[in-house]
Each structure stands twice: as C-alpha cells, then as structure tokens.
Amino acid sequence: MNKRFIKKLIGLIMIAVGLGVLLSSIGLNVRQYFSKEKTIKEFKEYIASGEGFSEEDIEVPAEGEMLCILRIPSIESENPVRQGLEKSILSDSLGHDMSTVVPGQMGNCVIAGHRNYTFGKFFNRLDEVQINDLIYVDTPTQTYTYAVTEIKTVEPDDLSVLDPTDKEQLTLYTCTPIYVASHRLVIVAERVQ
C-alpha cells in the first residue's frame, strides 16, 4: 500500500464517520418528533372521549404516564408532560417533578425538560419566553392558564425551584446554556384563569 492510497482511505473513513453522526442526529430528531406528535394526538383523543378523570376524584397518573400537554404559544411550543424525571421520560417528553403538586392544585407545579440539539430538545426555545407570556396546561379535565411573572437563572444545586407556594404556580426549568448546562433557566408563572 502506498501513502496516497492510505490518505484516500483515511479521508473516506472520516467522511463516512461524519455522515454517520449527521444521519444519527437527524434520525433522533425525526423519531422524537413523531413520538411527540403521536403522544399529543392520543392524549387529545383521550380528553375528547370524556374518559378523563373527574375534578372531584382526581387520580394522579403513575410515573411515566401522561399528565398533561404544556403549550407556550409565544415560542410555538406544544409538548407532552409525563410523570417523573427519569432519563427515559425526559428523552421523549417533559417531566413533572412528582414531589410537587399537579396543575390546577394549590402550590408549586414543577415541570422540567432538556435543551439539546439531539434528544430531549423540548425546552430549546424556553429562553425566548418573556414576562406576561401565557402558558397553557391541558389536562383531562380542563385547560389551566398561567402568566409568566419571573425569569431567572440559578445554580444547578439551587432547589428553591421546588419550594411549595400558597398560590397556584407553574415552574419550568431546564439547563442553560445549551450544551454547557452550567446553570438552570427558571420560568415562574402564576395561574390567571
């Protein structure tokens, strides 16, 4: 084998690896998109069927089950929210911190999600949310409306985002900046309807 052949071979291998990484990323995004759309469609059909739980007898879904749909029109975001914060949950949806209340209950409902360019990119545009933007939470019984009242960045070990409150509050949090994840972006919203 001569040097010229080896250089060509190494070049072809590098191109193949680059294409593999690119196609893998595209494949992950496509799979996540269709999974999200299917989950939202099924949940909306469930709500429309009238088989949802009643306000009087609320049964909180088990870990991994659908809790609600979170909509933020100002950033064109509509995403499923499942119970729990396990890696498998956050790769395909947002996650509800089960140590906090569910939407519509008095207290602090905390929902977390990833910001990434591959898997779990549900909160990629969360940093574009502004004070007074509306956030909608669709549950099997009703839609809750919240208005953004506070936007802040905290340290990763700051657990104050989980603190209970004496009002109906929605707290969204995610890593920031994208990929570096040195801090947490926190969006706080209060129920308006």
Language-model-derived ranges and their functions:
Residues 1-7:
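Short, Lys/Arg-rich N-terminal segment immediately upstream of the first membrane anchor
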Residues 8-193:
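Solvent-exposed, non-transmembrane regions of membrane-associated and secreted proteins
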